Amino acid sequence: MTKNIHDQRILILDFGSQYTQLVARRVREIGVYCELWSWDVEEADIREFNPDGIILSGGPESVTEDNSPRAPQYVFDSGVPVLGVCYGMQTMAEQLGGKVSTSDEREFGYAAVKVSGESAIFKDLEATQDVWMSHGDKVVEIPAGFTKVGETDTCPYAAMANEEKKYYGVQFHPEVTHTKNGLQMLENFVLGICGCERLWTSESIIEDAVARIKEQVGDDEVILGLSGGVDSSVVAMLVHRAIGDKLTCVFVDNGLLRLNEGQQVMDMFGDKFGLNIIKVDAEERFLKALEGKSDPEEKRKTIGHVFVDVFDEESKKLKNAKWLAQGTIYPDVIESAASKTGKAHVIKSHHNVGGLPDDMEMGLVEPLRELFKDEVRKIGLELGLPYEMLYRHPFPGPGLGVRVLGEIKKEYCDLLRRADAIFIEELHAADLYNKVSQAFTVFLPVRSVGVMGDGRKYDWVVSLRAVETIDFMTAHWAHLPYDFLGKVSNRIINEVNGISRVVYDISGKPPATIEWE
């Protein structure tokens, strides 16, 4: 590796926009490392980070209000290029001597920006740009040294630039896909104006992570709780590539997994990739602990506590393990930092998302803590993990523990596993699996009358759930074809003895959540 992948970096200051993480993901997509910090960061931290460019994000506040967030003055004294997006443009304008006013008419949705002049931010782009607006305030007077480089019918300063100082402001959101050439604009800023190179690639991330793991753990042994989920699977592959047999994975089968999932994990990581795996069959222990518990939160906590106990017992058997590997990813770090300090820039701090016991005297190895989920998946592919595993629908941490409503019983889990497997199999067969964002089956602990042959019988009910969403914050129920739903229902009722009725959940989020519990 000729260059350190962290040498060239962009700093994104977060003013609270729902799109801020998307800005960071786009910069990474371009091939440049970036970090996301709170707007009220100290000057010393920015100096230490030493960015090649700074992006000021959007945000929900109004620059015209007292005490609304401002960029640290050092941002404009540092001599590096600055791009202000939406609120970021407004605070840039106001802080550098321009004027912002509250507009009578909000601009929300698509808009056409007429580009004027020759600005580096619009290099190689046409004179009219389709963009996505979402703002109430607008810049009415630009600071000295700036020129107007874009306008819409209702927004006189849709983009402004001080080419000499390399300050740019856009009133729209280049990070969202609705802005047709938004990625090109961000490339113009990051690669052209800031002069960064594309050093941040899947191959270089893997190379860097492996080198850092080797340096961190030396000849010590490492233990990892392998769940078969995306994050822990990618951590397993990275750490194994770095230290080989000095990694031991502990796979706890809690009896709440999908059909044949336990065997699939062992086949893939043990047989195919040759990792050391200890499989703990803890189904009885989990089910015993869950007896009589029907409250979803209580079930979640119980499952978490039992997992910690089992993992702790296994780790104590591995006397030489000095390090614990975890699948913490960057959004976990941002969320944890923000909730603890209000500032999202403590990327180096330990963030024990696994909730493992405090008295585990081990160092933490967290090779994914700089990565977004889409980056984790990409490096998983590069490491040889199958696409179907990396891109399958989300599965909750407590597993079927929150998909069996009410009390958990082995009978219910077994019925649900088989019904869910049929639903997922049919989605794949009909080429619908990748057209929905998440699909699963829920077990309802109610009996319903059914007719089989000449007899009536009372059996259980399951609900199918499929949603379409971009961010999982809001979701629409998926309009699956009636014929398809009919086929799934027939198969489940005929093939899973004990289920007599199948329903389809047509609730959106909000008001409903995606999972039932």
UniProtKB/Swiss-Prot annotation:
Active site: C86 (nucleophile), H173, E175
InterPro entries: Class_I_gatase-like, GATASE, GMP_synth_C, GMP_synth_GATase, GMP_synthase, GMPS_ATP_PPase_dom, NAD/GMP_synthase, Rossmann-like_a/b/a_fold
Domain GMPS ATP-PPase: 200-392
Matches recorded under Gene3D superfamilies: 3.30.300.10, 3.40.50.880, HUPs (3.40.50.620)
EC number: 6.3.5.2
This protein's UniProt keywords: ATP-binding, Glutamine amidotransferase, GMP biosynthesis, Ligase, Nucleotide-binding, Purine biosynthesis
Binding site for ATP: S227, G228, G229, V230, D231, S232, S233
Domain of life: Bacteria
Recorded coiled-coil stretches: none
Biological or metabolic pathway of the protein: Purine metabolism; GMP biosynthesis; GMP from XMP (L-Gln route): step 1/1
Domain Glutamine amidotransferase type-1: 9-199
Catalytic activity: XMP + L-glutamine + ATP + H2O = GMP + L-glutamate + AMP + diphosphate + 2 H(+)
Enzyme category, top tier: ligase
Role according to the record: Catalyzes the synthesis of GMP from XMP.
NCBIfam families according to UniProt: guaA_Cterm (TIGR00884), guaA_Nterm (TIGR00888), PRK00074.1 (NF000848)
Subunit structure: Homodimer.
The name this protein goes by in its record: GMP synthase [glutamine-hydrolyzing]
Species of provenance: Vibrio vulnificus (strain CMCP6)
